[in-house]
Amino acid sequence: MILPITLTFAGAAAILHIWLSIRVSRLRRPLKIGVGDGGNEVLARRMRAHGNFAENVPIFLVLLGFLELATGGNLWLWGAAILFILARIAHAFGMDRPGANPLRVAGISLSWAILLGLGVYAILVAYQNPPIYRGLQVSPGRSASLQP
């Protein structure tokens, strides 16, 4: 089964991941810093933008993939995925500026809101149509019963 929403945004995330990596590498060469940030604040911020991306995107893609598989996909998932990618871009640009700023705050806040929303949606979908496990019907609020 092809998951077009998940594949589209996994591809977009891979491209963004490379872009964030290049932003770090382009600073490392002229600064001659191979490992760590060498005390350079700009490099440290770009490294954290890259790291934060790497920390948040995997759970987003897992949730997106399972929800698309469970629901067949819908406009809400497309919208959440578009907003998540835009939030990650905003966060990366916001990290270039020292201190808290609107891009950084909006980027991380929107990312967290989307992850929370997808997490709640996943839990709701999981119990919307109870699964059948080897002839055992499991329903919330009722005891399990054998099905023919």
Language-model features: where?
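Interfacial loop-to-transmembrane junctions
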Residues: 90-116
